[in-house]
């Protein structure tokens, strides 16, 4: 997926992984009962924040990384017909290595 959006400072843009629609036994989960997703793919990264000495601090994630992030972190946005999440790099809890 190509996203032409550039986040500022230490922010990243994530394409969220959709929550399961059914249980293992085949029951359909209504939207009101679904857990908020906490996993997604990084589609854009900012240049990093500036520290107290004026040096740019690079981010620990890159475009294409699969990440787990804080449940209530970030801001949901709709851009170019896609639902995306913009969040601070400090809201990323882990990078998934598969």
UniProtKB/Swiss-Prot annotation:
Its main location: cytoplasm. One of its GO terms (biological process) is chaperone cofactor-dependent protein refolding. GO terms for cellular component: cytoplasm. Keywords: Chaperone, Cytoplasm. Gene3D superfamilies: GroES chaperonin. The keyword Chaperone applies. InterPro entries: Chaperonin_GroES, Chaperonin_GroES_sf, Chaprnonin_Cpn10_CS, GroES-like_sf. It is found in: Cytoplasm. One of its GO terms (molecular function) is ATP binding. Transmembrane segments: none annotated. It comes from the Bacteria. The keyword Chaperone applies. Belongs to the GroES chaperonin family. HAMAP family: CH10. Together with the chaperonin GroEL, plays an essential role in assisting protein folding. The GroEL-GroES system forms a nano-cage that allows encapsulation of the non-native substrate proteins and provides a physical environment optimized to promote and accelerate protein folding. GroES binds to the apical surface of the GroEL ring, thereby capping the opening of the GroEL channel. Heptamer of 7 subunits arranged in a ring. Interacts with the chaperonin GroEL. This is Co-chaperonin GroES. It comes from Clavibacter michiganensis subsp. michiganensis (strain NCPPB 382). The gene is groES.
